Amino acid sequence: WQLGWVAANDGNVSVKLPDGNFLVTPTGISKSFITPEKLVIIDKDMNIVEAEGNYKPSSEIKMHMRCYTERDDVGAVVHAHPPTATGYAVAGKSLDEYSMIETVIAIGSIPLTPYGTPSTNEVPEAIAPYLAEHDVLLLQNHGALTVGCDLITAYYRMETLELFAKISLNAHLLGGAKEIPKEQIDKLLYLRDNYYHVTGKHPGYKHYNIS
């Protein structure tokens, strides 16, 4: 919320705990008002293990749990509405391009997943096919989702996404982004694996749905 990625009760965060349970932000409360004791602990079946008062887990918890189910390496999930990245999602446009070195190394191309009604199984079903190769997703007409081995990694990926969206928008206003050639992409991916040792998944040089 401090960066303007969410407003009011928007957005949600979850973290996998060492005992196999999950720490989740509560539903119906602004992120600016959340204190540690207001966080909710649930089990893998989304049953509440520990919660203060009447606090319940985020209404988007099904989306979070699908990430953990699909990927054993996921330790945290962040969902937010960063304005520029979400602008792409609302416009029906992906960020499925290879035009900035740092983004290629850190997260790769960013697909736009199909529309799904929040809080239902539609969103988990929509994102599932993309999780095998992506740590960062745009949710059509909704926002953005990032996963990571831990919370700081998932957060950094959301930050990287929003900055890239801003740069991409500026590039398109200037006539269009210039894509990096495949042979250069291969070199960057080598650096990702052998120098930076970036965790998570990467689609390689692959396009899903440029629009």
Located regions from the model:
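Glycine-rich flexible loops
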Residues: W1-S211
